[in-house]
Amino acid sequence: MSVSEIKMVAFGNPKRNDNAFTISSYSDSMGAQTRFITCGDNESFSNFNHGNIDWRNSTNGIHWLINSAETILSGESPKSAVGAGMTFGELEGAKMVMIVEVPEKSEDISKSWGFVISRIRQIHVLFFTPRALDAISKLEQIPVENLLKEIRNRGLVPHVCTYLSDEKKAIVEHSMGSVSIITKKSLQPLEWLARYICNLPFSGIGNLGVKNACLG
């Protein structure tokens, strides 16, 4: 298997300026097969008819369904669409990627994080931006250095991770251990995540497989 065989779907706002689209764009540039789903051209994202999305067909045969937690703050329709996509995607065998970022209104992070917690058993890769790592650490009252491991243990998420651009460091807590690894060059956090999920399906198992994906 190669990156060109990796299939993923991302859901986000029609402006295409959110984290889900960014991951899709990075992955597309690496050769993955990507599709971005949003509302119709003449619809408002906050209240579009999310029932028009055929999630069963859209997620059939894909590796990853990508969502960003702050999407649910855009309105009831996006929130319902994220939930429906995760439910149907899980039934179709897709694995869920969830990005946690500090929203534009930072006080809303408790809402977006609450949604993540409510769906945490459906998530396969949970990624925190560095800003979100600090914010959730304060919200959960868990030291930042322990946060990824604590969340993985609580939620049984297979991969809980972050990337620190200044240190060129990827940190992954996974079901078989922990990995902290320095990449060859400094990457943007979402650029690293795109590389990680593009390489993870064929990088092998255990710590070595995770390390290989981290450096992909």
What are these regions (language model features)?
Residues 1-216:
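Ribokinase/PfkB-type carbohydrate-kinase core domain
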